[in-house]
């Protein structure tokens, strides 16, 4: 019987409360969007298998929604994480400023060399933008990581972001060729759909 997957990667989403972490996970794992989640309740984790570089990668994506204030609880989640996605809300400048604190948290708690990815969520709310894309690109380049602007509501760049992180983990682990698959840090793939408006405020 064929194996269901070649690799299992544990991913973790961190960031301030209300930036849309749970919505991103639900969009990625179930391709659905619901803005009625209760902000203090996380979903633990969701699983989705993706094809990357000819390999079946099972992604176990952990949510930390509602636990941002309990640093010790969140610390336990770092254990075993191979990739960490830092999420901010493009309409909330404070959530972007706090990315530096989350970077520090990764350094203190996560495994050395863990892959990281920066996501600016809710990019469908362009009219309410407070964080310019150039600011995020600069930050991503300073840390040598990739950056995407996403929308859990319109699904923009969600699959691309998760697959990109999975590919980086795979290549780093020597699971496949390491040629030109890497995209320069600080870039995203496609512009966000500005027609939709996001109401998801959950972690």
Curated annotation (Swiss-Prot):
Highest taxon listed in the record's lineage: Eukaryota
Residue positions of covalent lipid attachment, annotated as S-geranylgeranyl cysteine: 200
Membrane topology annotation: Lipid-anchor
GO terms under cellular component: bicellular tight junction; cytoplasmic vesicle; endocytic vesicle; endosome; insulin-responsive compartment; lamellipodium; lateral plasma membrane; neuron projection
Chloroplast as UniProt keyword: no
Post-translational modification: Ubiquitinated via 'Lys-11'-linked ubiquitination on Lys-46 and Lys-58; impairing the recruitment of guanosine diphosphate (GDP) dissociation inhibitor 1/GDI1.
Amino acids binding Mg(2+): 22, 40, 63
Protein name listed in UniProt: Ras-related protein Rab-13
Subcellular location: Cell membrane; Cytoplasmic vesicle membrane; Cell junction, Tight junction; Golgi apparatus, trans-Golgi network membrane
Record bears the keyword Hydrolase: yes
Location of region: Disordered: 173-203
Organism listed in the record: Canis lupus familiaris (Dog)
Propeptide residue interval(s): 201-203
Cysteine methyl ester modified-residue sites: 200
Domain description: Switch 1, switch 2 and the interswitch regions are characteristic of Rab GTPases and mediate the interactions with Rab downstream effectors. The switch regions undergo conformational changes upon nucleotide binding which drive interaction with specific sets of effector proteins, with most effectors only binding to GTP-bound Rab.
Named cofactor requirement(s): Mg(2+)
EC number: 3.6.5.2
Sequence motif: Switch 2, positions: 63-80
Biological process, per Gene Ontology: bicellular tight junction assembly; cellular response to insulin stimulus; cortical actin cytoskeleton organization; endocytic recycling; endothelial cell chemotaxis; establishment of Sertoli cell barrier; exocytosis; neuron projection development
CDD domains xref list: Rab8_Rab10_Rab13_like
One annotated GO molecular function: GTP binding
């Amino acid at each position: 019987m064929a194996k269901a997957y070649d690799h299992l990667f544990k991913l973790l989403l961190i960031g301030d409360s209300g930036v849309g972490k749970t919505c991103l996970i639900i969009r990625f794992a179930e391709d659905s969007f619901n803005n009625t989640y209760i902000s203090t309740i996380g979903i633990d984790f969701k699983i989705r298998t993706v094809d990357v570089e000819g390999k079946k990668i099972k992604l176990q994506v952990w949510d930390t929604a509602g636990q941002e204030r309990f640093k010790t609880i969140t610390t336990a989640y770092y254990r075993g994480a191979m990739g960490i996605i830092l999420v901010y809300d493009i309409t909330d400048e404070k959530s972007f400023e706090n990315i530096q604190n989350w970077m520090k948290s990764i350094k203190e708690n996560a495994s050395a060399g863990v892959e990281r990815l920066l996501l600016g969520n809710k990019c469908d709310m362009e009219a309410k933008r407070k964080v310019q894309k150039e600011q995020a690109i600069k930050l991503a380049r300073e840390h040598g990581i990739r950056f995407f602007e996403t929308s859990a509501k319109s699904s923009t760049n969600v699959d691309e972001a998760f697959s990109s992180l999975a590919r980086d983990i795979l290549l780093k682990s020597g699971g496949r060729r390491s040629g030109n698959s890497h995209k320069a840090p600080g870039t995203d793939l496609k512009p966000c759909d500005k027609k939709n408006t996001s109401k998801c405020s959950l972690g």
